[in-house]
């Protein structure tokens, strides 16, 4: 839609003392600009997520027998390098995915939490095995009933112990979720200057809700 703007010109010596000009709808220009920037932002996010999902560096960390199955995925039979996750890191500061493979004991819980906090964003967690998921058969005082009680978990891999194919499937599920993430790409520049957004992942926001669902009430409290 075209708009005609009429501007008064008091210094004009001829009639009419005004100037008419036909311009585009300013709302249409803003929509076109926002659509272009939105598509450009989607393209940048897709490119960043594609690189992140194909360069997952696992943290070399195992707590029990499930780690044996995890190590099997690195052999030539399963070849975890096909998914870009063969670069095992010995330091949490160089890794972006922690695979908790095995039982999480109470004495090990603060160590796991500290190592998770030392990892840089973006970071993900895979809980491997029944013991890491819910404590497994160890319903005793010395075992944490699920590693998600201390750190947020992205993917749960069931089994006791799970086969290497199950871990690979869990890794593929994590890659699929990474492609749908909308994380800040870094420093943003806008009309108000330069800023770096701090966004809390939805996984961390709903951590307490997930724990509340897993905490079953006793018959006395029903």
Swiss-Prot record:
Its EC number is 7.1.1.-. Pfam families: Oxidored_q6. It is a peripheral membrane protein. Its cofactor is [4Fe-4S] cluster. It is an enzyme of class 7 (translocase). It is found in: Cell inner membrane. Residues 201-212 have a biased composition (Basic and acidic residues). It comes from the Bacteria. Its main location: membrane. Belongs to the complex I 20 kDa subunit family. NDH-1 shuttles electrons from NADH, via FMN and iron-sulfur (Fe-S) centers, to quinones in the respiratory chain. The immediate electron acceptor for the enzyme in this species is believed to be ubiquinone. Couples the redox reaction to proton translocation (for every two electrons transferred, four hydrogen ions are translocated across the cytoplasmic membrane), and thus conserves the redox energy in a proton gradient. NDH-1 is composed of 14 different subunits. Subunits NuoB, C, D, E, F, and G constitute the peripheral sector of the complex. This is NADH-quinone oxidoreductase subunit B. It comes from Psychrobacter arcticus (strain DSM 17307 / VKM B-2377 / 273-4).
């Amino acid at each position: 839609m075209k708009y005609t703007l009429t501007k008064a010109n008091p210094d004009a010596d001829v009639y009419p003392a005004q100037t008419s000009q036909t311009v585009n709808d300013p709302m249409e220009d803003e929509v076109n600009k926002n659509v272009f920037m939105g598509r450009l932002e989607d393209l940048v996010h897709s490119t960043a997520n594609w690189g992140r999902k194909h360069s997952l560096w696992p943290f070399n960390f195992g707590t029990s027998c499930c780690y044996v199955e995890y190590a099997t995925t690195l052999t030539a039979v399963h070849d975890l390098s096909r998914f870009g996750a063969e670069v095992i890191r010995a330091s949490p500061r160089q890794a972006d995915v922690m695979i908790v493979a095995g039982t999480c004991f109470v004495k090990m819980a603060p160590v796991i939490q500290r190592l998770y906090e030392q990892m840089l964003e973006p970071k993900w967690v895979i809980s491997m095995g029944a013991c890491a998921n819910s404590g497994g058969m160890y319903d005793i005082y010395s075992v944490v009933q699920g590693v998600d009680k201390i750190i947020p978990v992205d993917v749960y891999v069931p089994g006791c112990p799970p086969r290497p194919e199950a871990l690979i499937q869990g890794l593929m599920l994590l890659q699929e979720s990474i492609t749908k993430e909308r994380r800040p790409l870094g420093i943003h520049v806008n009309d108000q200057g330069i800023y770096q957004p701090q966004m809390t992942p939805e996984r961390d926001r709903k951590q307490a809700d997930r724990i509340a669902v897993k905490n079953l009430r006793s018959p006395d409290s029903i």
